[in-house]
Amino acid sequence: HAPNALVLTVAKGETARTATPLRAVTLTCAPTPGGTHPAPEAACAELRAVDGRFSALRGDQDRACIKIYDPLVVTAEGVWEGQRVRYERTFGNSCTLQTEAGPVFSF
């Protein structure tokens, strides 16, 4: 198995550089799901389904969200299938984060 080791964060703000970190977890997916992530099996399954492409993650698309702007920024840094990854995305609020990113950033 190629190495998979990630640090995932959720922060309050518009960019990772200026945001206030709220939560951080570790996630490993090989040889078995683990780390401090509360649901590593679901998160790893979701990442495998999109070949590790964080931008392709899809959460609960049927969920309706209110339009209050309270931005959260998520980051992922580490190694996926032996390749370095660095990902950052800002969501309008916690509801859109869960709707669009799913179990990977549910912590």
From Swiss-Prot:
The keyword Disulfide bond applies. Its main location: secreted. One of its GO terms (molecular function) is serine-type endopeptidase inhibitor activity. Pfam families: SSI. One of its GO terms (cellular component) is extracellular region. The record marks 67-68 as: Reactive bond. Transmembrane segments: none annotated. It comes from the Bacteria. InterPro entries: Prot_inh_I16_SSI, Prot_inh_SSI_I16_CS, Subtilisin_inhibitor, Subtilisin_inhibitor-like_sf. Gene3D superfamilies: Subtilisin inhibitor-like (3.30.350.10). It is found in: Secreted. Disulfide bonds join 29-44, 65-95. Keywords: Disulfide bond, Protease inhibitor, Secreted, Serine protease inhibitor. The keyword Secreted applies. Homodimer. Strong inhibitory activity toward subtilisin BPN' and, to a lesser extent, toward trypsin. Belongs to the protease inhibitor I16 (SSI) family. This is Subtilisin inhibitor-like protein 5. It comes from Streptomyces fradiae.
